[in-house]
């Protein structure tokens, strides 16, 4: 099977896919922020949450429902910063996935990725990683929302976790973005083969 990638390009394609998958899994999982409420573990993502209080009509009180789910609407996300983070990080993940899938196709299709296309793809990966990094930087601005404060012993504030801690999904998302910005962007410069010039 013919390829439009150099040996470095094949490594770039695999690394691009790994970085995109890492960032996307981290973005989708609701384990960015970990805490507890009413003795139950609670976790937050940018647009998802695990364990939340509901009104128990039978007992006439509030109980914790231990399951994960999305917020009912975009406006239901606890803070404006988390809404912006969701959009920015989602776009960044989409860009990384687009380049990764194109790079994987370049392993199987001739003349798909030239040196110029490889460099453009690297630039897109840099922008995608930058967007995800911006989303990760915005996330702590939402720690002062009421939902987070209830989970973090009413002691959290912007850039202050209180009794909560950062979860693995936050690190996963950031690490995928950082690797895409540094490694993938650099390797993309050497990914495509030199185009043949055909005489007409």
Swiss-Prot record:
Pfam families assigned to the protein according to its UniProt record, in alphabetical order: L_HMGIC_fpl (PF10242)
UniProt membrane topology term: Multi-pass membrane protein
TM annotation in the entry: 84-104, 123-143, 172-192
Alphabetical keyword list: Glycoprotein, Membrane, Signal, Transmembrane, Transmembrane helix
Presence of the UniProt keyword Phosphoprotein in the record: no
Keyword Chaperone included in the entry's annotation: no
Subcellular location(s) per record: Membrane
Major localization class: membrane
Cleaved signal peptide residues: 1-21
GO CC annotations on file: membrane
Carbohydrate attachment residues: 154
Family stated for the protein in its record: Belongs to the LHFP family.
Stored PANTHER family: LHFPL TETRASPAN SUBFAMILY MEMBER 6 PROTEIN-RELATED, LIPOMA HMGIC FUSION PARTNER-LIKE PROTEIN
Protein's name in the database: LHFPL tetraspan subfamily member 6 protein
Provenance organism: Danio rerio
